[in-house]
Amino acid sequence: MITTSAPPPIAGREEELLSLMQQAAAGPQIASALPLQSIRSAFACALHMHQPTIPAGPDGALISHLQYMLDHPGEGDNHNAEPFAHCYRRMAELIPELIGEGCTPRIMLDYSGNLLWGVTQMGRDDITGALRFLACDPEMQGHVEFLGSFWSHAVAPSTPIPDLKLQISAWQHQFAAMFGDEALLRVRGFSPPEMHLPNHPDTLFSFITALRESGYQWLLVQEHSVENLDGAPLSREQCLLPNRLVARNACGEEIAITALIKTQGSDTKLVGQMQPCYEALGLDRLPLGTTTVPALVTQIADGENGGVMMNEFPEAFRQAHRRLRDNGDGCIALNGTEYLAQLDAAGIDDSAYPIIQAVGQSRLWEAVGSAPTPAAVQAAIARLEQADPSFAMEGSSWTNDLSWVQGYDNVLEPMQELSARFHARFDPLRDQDPTISRRADYQEALLHLLLLETSCFRYWGQGTWTDYAKTIHQRGMALLD
């Protein structure tokens, strides 16, 4: 049952939020369990939560897939709807429980804009109230860090470049509307959906530029999606340190952002069984610049999918934090921004971090030569792809067995068409009057553009999900006719 048909808060405050996010964020209100010099190692775990928006409600209304699961309990694993809902709110129970036991728990939370809107649509005050507590309560701020993302779980490499910033901004609008500007000001880390990092020079440069302009200070990346400047993979020790991800576009311009490295592949058991904690317990400080810093194991997993996350994670989370409380021996839980802030306070900034780049850049820039131009880059990519079929500039993610581009022309071409139509209609108007983004027709068209870019319409193969995409595309085009 949809309780509200109100559109999501995805636009209208662009300049205001950009200005807000250039302010310095207040640090965590609670000190870590140990001073930096006493920390031997640490781990940072993130939970990724997402439910897509689909045109499957009454008369084709846009509803959360969580709502669809509740309405159709006999299909597939839809009987898990309420267990999923519990997963979306349970950290508001687990964190205070462990604090009460004398533990110092930490968790990072990555909620898609779709899901935040969906639980609002559904009137699930149990979930929104729990998230508001985690985002706004002064005590929780030292234990819980929210990560930003794209609003509709788009994957960056196949998202039209002009829409990267729209996706980032829409999520910030949604989060601020639900939890307030002060809570948004604390969101400084970014979790790209599917850990999908673009490796096309212009896409990556635009992505990192949009993140930096939007106030993000660091990015979570998958270890196999990046390389060192010489093309070599990251060393094991390097994966346990912050790195400096440099993006260079086809004109030779460069921009950088701090990257924390998610190791290994897509396996919810890694977080579900708190493997990062037990890995960190066996690690020591590592050299960085002229000093040493705590090794940091960084990991993310779906927060609700699968029996391990639904059933085993809560007790594993408790056991790990009790173990640290009783016999941590210099190993603690930290959140990403907290770890980087401690390094910064100790005089260790990103100039000391190892420099990395997106995978494939070394081969590309060697082929381009010393005078990069868009034409030279395009020609070099074509030569490399012809000589080596495994060379690709789509990007890289934790699901390299799945292509987000190949075989989905019937989704990607309409998506590019809708994006082009949207920008042709509204960009000239926005140049004249930025407040046009407050208009209902702008926001309705933007909503359909963002929704069409949802990865789920490509993840599950041809059929119902691509039909959903077709419906959203048709409605979006009609709005722009």
Which functions belong to the PLM regions below?
Residues I2-H86, N114, R236-D267, Q275-E279, ...:
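Active-site and substrate-binding clefts of carbohydrate-active enzymes
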Residues R40-L47, P52-P160, A183-P192, Q217-Q222:
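Short, well-structured secondary-structure segments
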Residues P55, C87-L94, G100-C103, Y111, ...:
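Extended, H/D-rich, highly charged conserved domains that either
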Residues N78-I95, G123-L134, L164-S169, D202-F207, ...:
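Well-ordered, non-membrane alpha-helical segments in soluble/globular domains
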Residues C87-L98, Q167-F175, A445, I472, ...:
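Alpha-helical packing segments of well-folded alpha/beta enzyme cores
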Residues I127-E145, I168-H173, F207-E227, E237-C251, ...:
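Acidic, His- and aromatic-enriched active-site or binding-groove loops in soluble protein domains
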Residues L164-E194, A250, D284-Q299:
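CE4/NodB-like, metal-dependent polysaccharide N-deacetylase domain
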Residues W171-Q172, F179-S235, N305-G328:
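Catalytic domains of cell-wall/extracellular-matrix polysaccharide-remodeling enzymes
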